[in-house]
Regions:
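Extracytoplasmic catalytic/substrate-binding loops of multi-pass membrane glycan-assembly enzymes
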Residues: 24-39, 49-64
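Start-transfer (signal-anchor) and selected internal transmembrane alpha helices
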Residues: 1-21
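Membrane-interface transmembrane helices that cradle and orient dolichyl/undecaprenyl
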Residues: 132-155
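Juxtamembrane segments of multi-pass membrane glycosylation machinery
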Residues: 45-47, 51, 63-77, 97-98
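Loop-to-helix entry region of an early transmembrane alpha helix in multi-pass inner-membrane enzymes
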Residues: 55, 59, 69-87
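Transmembrane-helix signature of polytopic, membrane-embedded enzymes
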Residues: 86-116, 130, 149
Length: 174
């Protein structure tokens, strides 16, 4: 079935507004979000990751924090990550289930969980999800059609990118 781009864009925008922008505007950010914003600022002040301050996320995540300087511009990357996650999750789900209703319910459940779990923090995991779901999509495409074996290198590259964004969740769920 065709990818419901409009539905994915609407859910992505709602989740981004509720979990990434609203906490900043209302001043109810979590400790994780405050620490991530601080890291973006500290890197610009000459701080070193893992030496001058504690960090448990991946190097690419901290590079992104350095680029956006811990600002609200980060919400644009968060939005893109949720958009990619929704698209690749939909593609992976339709590869193993031909029931459109259940696939759409899975998509709604994903966005509700992503919004609830990342309210004010946990952004590195959300940024890693498109790469994890892309790898899942490629692996499921191979399982459905074993003649389609072009993608193992892409699976490895996507898992590596996910690992450099959020090492612990990637190691646990890949």
């Amino acid at each position: 079935s065709p990818i419901p781009f409009l539905r994915i864009i609407i859910w992505t925008t709602l989740v981004t507004l509720l979990s990434a922008i609203t906490p900043v505007l209302l001043g109810v950010t979590s400790l994780q979000h405050s620490a991530d914003s601080y890291i973006g600022w500290a890197l610009h002040q000459g701080g070193d990751i893992y030496t001058n301050f504690f960090g448990s996320e991946g190097l690419l995540y901290y590079l992104l924090q350095f680029i956006v300087k811990g600002s609200i511009v980060f919400a644009a990357f968060y939005w893109l990550a949720l958009l990619g996650s929704g698209i690749f999750l939909f593609r992976a789900a339709t590869a193993i289930s031909k029931r459109d209703k259940q696939v759409h319910q899975l998509l709604i459940g994903f966005y509700l969980l992503a919004g609830g779990l990342s309210f004010g923090g946990g952004y590195a995991t959300i940024l890693a999800l498109p790469f994890l779901f892309y790898g899942l999509d490629l692996a499921l495409a191979y399982m459905v059609d074993s003649n389609n074996d072009k993608g193992f290198l892409r699976i490895g590259m996507s898992m590596a990118l996910a690992f450099f964004l959020a090492p612990l969740p990637t190691a646990l769920y890949s």
